[in-house]
């Protein structure tokens, strides 16, 4: 249905409506009959329109399909740089017919897409002719390429022509189009760019780039060598590309961004030719002012050399090294490479004189995630009840791209939930909780170990109150109350050992610990580690800790550690795989395995207590055979806290039975107190199995219509479910606790 018509609402004002989808990328302006008559325009007449949000665009006049006055719709495909179409009202005096004589010659500056590589001038001109065919253009305006149109060109800057296309000119089939050799003046005006969570890294990169680009002669006079190449390393999605573009914009440098895989050619020598062409183009830009060449995914272009079948890659690496060595002649030329696999780069590329400096962007910390969320949600209608600090705590391991996807999914949930109120949707906390189910951290994908857990609350574990308190003191309290711990001179333990009889909820306690801490959780078992190949198990364990350090705060859980690690004092001869895995674990606990590329951030004195503690990695191990563990693992500084998880006493068994029967229709004749007294030597797993068997007996007796579990069903279940613990085992653990490990356990 057409909107209500009128001559001109609010006097001589036209209401600006969104462009008709059928008019996208046509450069058309839809007007009513009265506006046509007022302007004296004809069908297809060029119009120069001043936009209410700033800037102007060049369109052709076309009548509205519903012939309603008082409204205007336009497609700003040819507009001034930075122009933006926003809803509002514009006056009739903002619409001016302009003459557009046919152009004999037109000069443009193409803006290439990042993945375009180094296309030839003929390929670029072919796309330019197709894009500008039979269109009006204006000097200083930018013509954008429609989305989905293939080709290397993203946009065109109109530089000039004959006759001068100011205020307008018409491109005809006879117009001779050439590519300008001079870039447009200040295509992107410098200004501070909001980089959520990257301000510290941006400052480091900005200082590295600003000095050689702005003060090359002064540095040469002082005899200082400035870096010619900078390598950005970090996981995918942290914002490496965005950071380089923002810093180049702020420093006023001309940015030439290239995706390294796009330079790969199919025929021999084509890749080297593309690389030379890109460097030549960057040096031409440097001859006119500061220039920055950005090579994204540089590891695809310069992999580690070696092997008989890698001759083509070796030639490409040699070509890049030669070109990097020749940069010193251009004082206003800097190369920036980005990779998420720095270890795959050829070592010759990472020496001084080529990539002199390396800037590491790690997975965002707590404060950085909060800053990123503030930037992303600044233009979103979020509820005032949403605590971004709490969201930042819940998004451990999320990079900038993950947080963007999370907010986008939350917005979609809000939109679908409020379909009837789409004019003013509001994003609530429930929308973010729903989005958490669909958006997982990208850094957890394709990783060793279980990265996600089914949430378990402390209240779902019956008994063991002393053990729960000790676990909270060791892990939860340092993360939630860092200032109090710092005031008392306390530090978080490096490692925790849980030992006790089987079935006493050791693994469930760790799951509850990970649920309450909002930290990354990595669970590793023996099957994940052991491999038939020599050295593979140690490599996997190192990778687990590297992954955990990249997603701090992190909790690494090694279940049944006695089956994973060996002891150098009992029953082994020589150096088997288990002893080598033990050696790697000891080194990781001591911090020997931390690589330089994983360190990030500033000095600890410049960080808040919470930010420091949230960078920690804690290991929790569980076993029912602590007597076979190596003594070096049990000393303070490695597994600082050793906690005995005892079998439940009568009070603990009663608490466990209450938890197990919480969702079970138990009859009034059932006495949980008597059951707790009759189940001596039952572990927590045995009690849960007992309740399940009683429920099954109720179904067997009364059929599928059964509604109650009575005392007789529990009595029958006691005849089949036997305790898994024996007096001998309990005596063994009690003696072990009192004699063998008492010096490390503070009871």
UniProtKB/Swiss-Prot annotation:
It is found in: Cytoplasm; Cytoplasm, Cytoskeleton, Spindle; Nucleus. InterPro entries: AAA+_ATPase, AAA_ATPase_domain, AAA_lid_3, ATPase_AAA_core, ATPase_AAA_CS, P-loop_NTPase. In the context of 55LCC heterohexameric ATPase complex, the ATPase activity is stimulated by DNA binding and inhibited in presence of RNA. One of its GO terms (biological process) is ribosomal large subunit biogenesis. ATP 2 binds at residues 500-507. It catalyses: ATP + H2O = ADP + phosphate + H(+). ATP 1 binds at residues 234-241. GO terms for molecular function: ATP binding; ATP hydrolysis activity; identical protein binding; preribosome binding. PROSITE patterns: AAA (PS00674). Pfam families: AAA, AAA_lid_3. Keywords: Acetylation, ATP-binding, Cytoplasm, Cytoskeleton, Hydrolase, Nucleotide-binding, Nucleus, Repeat, Ribosome biogenesis. In adult ear, expressed at low levels in neurosensory hair cells (inner and outer) and supporting cells (pillar and Deiter cells). ATP-dependent chaperone part of the 55LCC heterohexameric ATPase complex which is chromatin-associated and promotes replisome proteostasis to maintain replication fork progression and genome stability. Required for replication fork progression, sister chromatid cohesion, and chromosome stability. The ATPase activity is specifically enhanced by replication fork DNA and is coupled to cysteine protease-dependent cleavage of replisome substrates in response to replication fork damage. Part of the 55LCC heterohexameric ATPase complex composed at least of AIRIM, AFG2A, AFG2B and CINP. Associates with pre-60S ribosomal particles. Belongs to the AAA ATPase family. AFG2 subfamily. This is ATPase family gene 2 protein homolog B. It comes from Mus musculus. The gene is Afg2b.
